[in-house]
């Protein structure tokens, strides 16, 4: 037996280094590395999803940039009245909020924002403690058009931009397609690094993105949210025709959509609850844009605006015909001189009277 | 044109009228690309089923892989999946028949039939459109009536990976005929050799001698092998998603419309394309190798840092190794190799590379690319012979500076050749015109620093790998650090992937 044991020893120790043990330890190390890798990946994913639920910094960077700027302004002048202008890129380019005296004015115009996005943004702003005293709300009527089963804004408010609660609100209240939107939301939550990747790069190294994807709207605005149109630009008929072709199907035979009306109602209700004065603004348009709705549709737009005014007791600023075609880049986005003129007129005719009525100095 | 290929919609026509089962399959796995969520789900299912089967049921495992591979292809096109399976069956029968007889003439006839059948399938699907259209143009130019209409190249359906599996089948027939290997007796093993989904659509081109022997070894779950597989898959996904697809943003618009861009932008696009094609194809190969390792199989390594090659000959020993060795063994050597005189060898080199070019695609661009590489190889051989008798020149070229210069010159030549690597020769010539005459034009919307950063990172990674530093580091890193590295690599690939990813360039071949 003693001999047998001796014979076994070399069999067990196949090499002086103890190769079988080393192999076992290598296998264990490999398994541990893989388990750690899977765990770390899952953890990173979960953290990312939780982060996007808690903060819009990565999920909705343009909104987050604006909110951050607004927060900074409010910290500087905490006692000032707050004048907020919610709207689309038309507002973003046109309103130089820094020109307003006697109150903190902020341009919260963001690309593609219609009544539904504005309603969401106002909710978020309220949660962040930014309750405006006066709200200028753009009535971007092409986005209010009844476009069938879904709201026109549906494709613009992508599922990766909203939280779970907002997703449910959009589905239940604003007619977003439930199954599809939930699926898209789940997908973006399942692979958040893929979904939010370009936003992450846009924040960390915007130069790595093509210039048309660098989200100039998020990073290029001034302290008051104005994304100043570049100097020296001129009206571009090619761009105008492209924009006209884009908006034509929505506007030609315009009728108000139920979902956007619900969003507008919610916005007005939120403002009433918080004591915010609201002014509806129809932004300036070039002649070709103004001619897009047929006479019946135009009448419907006018009567809808009148109804809103009567229903919610808001003031209305109809700026559609304020400027000629030479002031627009593409028929509905103002060039820099146009923006200056628009701001001056809006301050004189809209902001100052409302502020005075609210008792501002 | 590159992006036209890349963005070409998957072959959907067959699914409108096909069987409901295959339509359903197509919805689940619309394209056979490894970096898609659908493939990962499919692969996870295959892995789970495969490793759940006890080891003693080795043949059941093989059948599982055969069925999975068939479904992988059938999800894209069930008709073509049946075609591939059918030709594979015939190759199997030809092999068995060759094994059953000792009469040289019969064996030769069977081998020729098998080779001709595979080449026939390849020519019918891949080259028919090209040759008929060239014939059409030629007859029209001579004022004759062709008697048939011109084919639209976009309407000609070329089965994914046809060049890869036909070459595998040809090598099998030749090897059996030459008695290098025994004909495979087991049908499922032979089916797996051709249909194995990790290498089915874009290689590497496996040899029967290497693969069939692996099907006989019982497979055990091995964490080391799994780790290697996962590592390769992750590196491949990173190369494809984070580098190749990103580089496509630089080169695709320029190669699509070279007229519109200025000289500097076109030079940047050429550099970006060289990186893109390497990361795209080697990324795919890495993923294929990784997937195969996870199933317990080892495929041929297809790349070995080709852009660090110091001459074109070395480049071809490092680039698409499975194809270059195939061409060497089944074209260059049968043509006479370098056994004859200098001119004979040069002719063989040129012919081999021309066939290599034609293998990539039925278009003048690919043929010109093959010819250019053939000429480069001939030039290298001449220069090599010239240097042999000049000791000082040889010594200078072997210094660090000399090697660096040779690497740069090789990379420059290879990158210029990539310009030809597209179906439309006219566009390639426009690119050359732009490259060598200062012309103004558009610039890209991208900043060039991202391109230079990619070049720098890629070069650093290759140098670290070549120096063996990574091997040392990998062995010493604690497992949790290594694991976190995998997670970070995957997250980085997902973050850096452009929102509009592209297909793999080599899938068209």
Which sequence ranges carry the predicted segments?
Chain A
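N-terminal Lys/Arg-rich, disordered targeting/topogenic segments
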Residues: 1-30
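Hydrophobic membrane-insertion alpha-helices, especially the h-region
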Residues: 29-53
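Alpha-helical transmembrane signal-anchor/signal-peptide segments
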Residues: 51-75
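Short extracytoplasmic
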Residues: 67-98
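Membrane-embedded segments
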Residues: 86, 90-179
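Secreted/periplasmic serine-hydrolase-like ester/acetyl group-modifying domain
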Residues: 152-274
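Active-site segments of SGNH/GDSL-like serine hydrolases
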Residues: 196, 267-293
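Long, positively charged, glycine-interspersed low-complexity recognition regions
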Residues: 290-361
């Amino acid at each position: 037996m003693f001999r047998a044991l001796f014979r076994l020893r070399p069999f067990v120790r196949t090499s002086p280094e103890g190769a079988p043990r080393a192999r076992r330890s290598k296998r264990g190390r490999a398994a541990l590395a893989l388990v750690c890798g899977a765990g770390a990946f899952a953890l990173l994913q979960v953290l990312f999803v939780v982060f996007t639920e808690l903060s819009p910094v990565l999920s909705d960077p343009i909104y987050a940039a604006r909110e951050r700027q607004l927060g900074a302004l409010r910290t500087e002048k905490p006692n000032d009245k707050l004048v907020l202008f919610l709207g689309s890129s038309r507002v973003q380019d046109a309103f130089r909020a820094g020109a307003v005296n006697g109150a903190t004015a902020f341009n919260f115009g963001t690309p593609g924002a219609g009544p539904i996005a504005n309603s969401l943004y106002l909710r978020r702003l309220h949660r962040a403690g930014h309750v405006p005293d006066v709200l200028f709300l753009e009535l971007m009527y092409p986005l209010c058009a009844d476009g069938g089963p879904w709201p026109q804004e549906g494709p613009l408010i992508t599922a990766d931009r909203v939280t779970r609660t907002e997703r449910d609100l959009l589905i239940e209240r604003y007619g977003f397609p439930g199954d599809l939107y939930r699926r898209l939301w789940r997908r973006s939550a399942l692979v958040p690094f893929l979904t939010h990747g370009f936003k992450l790069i846009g924040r960390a190294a915007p130069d790595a993105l093509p210039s048309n994807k660098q989200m100039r709207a998020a990073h290029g605005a001034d302290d008051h949210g104005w994304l100043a149109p570049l100097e020296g630009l001129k009206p571009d008929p090619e761009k105008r025709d492209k924009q006209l072709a884009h908006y034509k199907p929505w506007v030609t035979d315009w009728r108000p959509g139920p979902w956007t009306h619900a969003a507008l109602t919610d916005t007005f209700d939120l403002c009433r609850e918080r004591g915010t004065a609201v002014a509806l603004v129809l932004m300036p348009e070039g002649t070709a844009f103004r001619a897009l709705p047929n006479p019946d549709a135009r009448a419907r737009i006018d009567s809808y605006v009148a109804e809103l005014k009567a229903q919610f007791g808001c003031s209305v600023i109809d700026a559609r015909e304020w400027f000629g075609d030479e002031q627009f880049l593409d028929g509905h986005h103002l060039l820099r001189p146009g923006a200056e003129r628009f701001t001056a007129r809006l301050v004189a005719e809209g902001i100052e009277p409302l502020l005075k009525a609210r008792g501002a100095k | 044109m590159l992006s036209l290929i890349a963005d070409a919609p998957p072959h959907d026509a067959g699914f409108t009228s096909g069987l409901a089962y295959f339509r359903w399959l197509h919805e689940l796995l619309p394209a056979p690309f490894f970096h898609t969520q659908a493939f990962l789900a499919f692969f996870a299912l295959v892995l789970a089923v495969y490793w759940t089967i006890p080891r003693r049921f080795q043949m059941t495992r093989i059948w599982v892989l055969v069925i999975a591979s068939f479904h992988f292809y059938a999800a894209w096109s069930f008709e073509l999946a049946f075609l591939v399976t059918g030709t594979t069956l015939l190759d199997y029968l030809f092999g068995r028949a060759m094994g059953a007889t000792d009469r040289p003439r019969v064996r030769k006839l069977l081998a020729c039939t098998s080779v001709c059948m595979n080449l026939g399938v390849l020519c019918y699907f891949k080259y028919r459109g090209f040759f008929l259209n060239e014939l059409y143009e030629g007859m029209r130019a001579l004022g004759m009536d062709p008697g048939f209409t011109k084919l639209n190249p976009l309407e000609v359906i070329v089965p994914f990976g046809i060049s890869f599996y036909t070459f595998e089948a040809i090598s099998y027939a030749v090897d059996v005929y030459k008695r290098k290997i025994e004909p495979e007796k087991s049908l499922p093993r032979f089916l797996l050799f051709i249909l194995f989904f990790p290498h089915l659509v874009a290689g590497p081109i496996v040899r029967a001698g290497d693969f069939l022997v692996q099907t006989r070894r019982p497979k055990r779950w091995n964490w080391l092998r799994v780790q290697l597989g996962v590592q390769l898959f992750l590196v491949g996904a990173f190369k494809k998603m984070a580098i190749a697809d990103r580089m496509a943003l630089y080169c695709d618009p320029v190669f699509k419309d070279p007229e519109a861009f200025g000289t500097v932008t076109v030079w940047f696009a050429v550099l970006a394309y060289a990186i893109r094609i390497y990361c795209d194809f080697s990324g795919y190969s890495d993923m294929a190798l990784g997937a195969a390792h996870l199933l317990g199989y080892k495929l041929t390594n297809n790349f070995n840092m080709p852009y660090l090659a110091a001459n074109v000959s070395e480049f071809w020993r490092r680039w698409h190794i499975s194809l270059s060795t195939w061409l060497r063994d089944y074209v260059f050597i049968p043509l006479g190799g370098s056994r004859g005189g200098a001119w004979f060898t040069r002719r063989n080199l040129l012919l081999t590379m021309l066939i290599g070019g034609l293998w990539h695609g039925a278009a003048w661009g690919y043929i010109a690319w093959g010819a250019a590489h053939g000429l480069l190889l001939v030039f290298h051989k001449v220069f090599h012979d010239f240097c042999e008798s000049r000791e000082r020149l040889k010594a200078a070229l072997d210094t660090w500076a000399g090697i660096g210069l040779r690497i740069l010159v090789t990379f420059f030549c290879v990158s210029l050749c990539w310009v030809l690597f597209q179906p439309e020769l006219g566009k390639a010539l426009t690119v050359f015109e732009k490259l060598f005459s200062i012309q103004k034009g558009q610039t890209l919307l991208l900043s060039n620093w991202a391109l230079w950063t990619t070049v720098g990172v890629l070069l650093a990674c290759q140098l670290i790998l070549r120096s063996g530093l990574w091997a040392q580091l990998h062995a010493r890193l604690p497992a949790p650090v290594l694991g976190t590295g995998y997670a970070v690599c995957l997250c980085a690939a997902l973050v850096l992937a452009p929102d509009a990813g592209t297909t793999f360039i080599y899938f068209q071949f």
